[in-house]
Amino acid sequence: METTKKLFALLCLFVTMNQAISVSDPDDMETFCMKSSRNTTSNTTYNKNLNTLLSTLSNQSSFANYYNLTTGLASDTVHGMFLCTGDVNRTTCNACVKNATIEIAKNCTNHREAIIYNVDCMVRYSDKFFLTTLETNPSYWWSSNDLIPKSFGKFGQRLSDKMGEVIVRSSLLSSSFTPYYLMDTTRFDNLYDLESIVQCTPDLDPRNCTTCLKLALQELTECCGNQVWAFIYTPNCMVSFDTYNSSLPPLPPPSRSGSFSHRGNNKLLGGMVLAVSVSVFAFLSLV
């Protein structure tokens, strides 16, 4: 009987923790609804323009991995964009943007500015013109809970050096089919490869793209430089790295099963998954 009670409590613990770390389910999306002195209501012209804009973004994601537009006039003007990562196909891009537009509309009701991140895409809208302007907040990162093996030596420095090279090369790709997107794979150990990916929104000039990527890389290496993989999004760029054993079959893309955190408001989620794991282990030891 006592064991049954403990198992029931454990089940409740799992449910509670799952709710605690859930962020904009169902698609692992993180939404930022910006505070504003001029919030809106559901029946305003601005909101109608916003709904039109989000619908257009969703539709256009079937044809491109980046799109921006402006709709409305004067104080009812809405600016918006989406960006899909350069390694996803049209079907994945469309699915991500479609879900993101639904989530951002649901989570940021009556907000005049918002942004939503997912590992495959981001969607943004605002009543202020933001294209061509470099912004670094809010940022959001995911990372593995697994640490780099000690046998890798000074991995953090090697990671910074390699990512720095990739950033310089990506700044030369402003006119490519997928502007500023670059993926590089380098053997850095007898068995392990380092995969580096960077990308900027195409509206940035090369100088601002480089600045955005360098700042994102700095934040990523500070938080996650010893992790097996990590990924960061900012409003204008993304940086990711992954290490894997090239002699083994490829693993599926990283999901948000590791730690995650963001910068730009008062919320902080980093390390929660690790805390969950420790708590569950401690509880199991009592059963």
From Swiss-Prot:
It comes from the Eukaryota. Belongs to the cysteine-rich repeat secretory protein family. GO terms for cellular component: plasma membrane. Glycans are attached at N39, N43, N59, N68, N89, N99, N107, N208, N245. The keyword Acetylation does not apply. Pfam families: Stress-antifung. PANTHER family: CYSTEINE-RICH REPEAT SECRETORY PROTEIN (PTHR32099), CYSTEINE-RICH REPEAT SECRETORY PROTEIN 57-RELATED (PTHR32099:SF85). Residues 287 are cytoplasmic. The chain crosses the membrane at residues 268-286. This is Cysteine-rich repeat secretory protein 58. The keyword Translocase does not apply. Residues 21-267 are extracellular. It comes from Arabidopsis thaliana. Keywords: Glycoprotein, Membrane, Repeat, Signal, Transmembrane, Transmembrane helix. It is found in: Membrane. InterPro entries: GNK2, GNK2_sf. Residues 28-130, 135-246 form the Gnk2-homologous domain. Residues 1-20 form the signal peptide.
